[in-house]
Design a protein with these regions (language model features):
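Short alpha-helical DNA-recognition segment
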Residues: 26-51
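A short, Lys/Arg-rich alpha-helix, primarily the initiator
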Residues: 1-26, 76
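Phosphate-coordinating loops and pocket residues in cytosolic domains that bind phosphorylated ligands
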Residues: 51, 80-81
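Short alpha-helical elements of helix-turn-helix
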Residues: 15, 31, 47, 61-64
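The DNA-recognition helices of helix-turn-helix-type DNA-binding domains
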Residues: 40, 56, 81-82
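DNA major-groove recognition helix of helix-turn-helix/homeodomain DNA-binding modules
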Residues: 36, 56, 60-77
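Generic non-transmembrane alpha-helical segments
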Residues: 16, 20, 36-40, 70
Length: 82
């Protein structure tokens, strides 16, 4: 059986984004994160953020950067060991 691209690769940083979102004080909801991103000109709704965190949606580089800024963490915190 031939593997599809979807089966071979996945978004590896989604769970780390979720961890960073929930570590904020107070924790940031997906809706709140969507609002913070919209204020920065990046339009991801709650559903898109959920898909990112569950590793079913890929991210663009500018989205990773905007999410890090919105959560006040470094981009590097999304990479490496959890």
């Amino acid at each position: 059986m031939k593997k599809t691209r979807k089966a071979q690769a996945r978004n590896e940083i989604g769970p780390r984004i979720r961890q960073a979102r929930l570590r904020c004080q107070p924790p940031v909801s997906q809706d709140d994160l969507a609002g913070k991103l919209a204020a920065r000109g990046v339009y991801l709704d709650r559903t898109a953020i959920s898909r990112i965190e569950s590793q079913s949606r890929y991210l663009m580089d500018y989205e990773i950067s905007a999410i890090a800024r919105a959560l006040k963490v470094t981009v590097a915190s999304f990479f490496g060991e959890p």
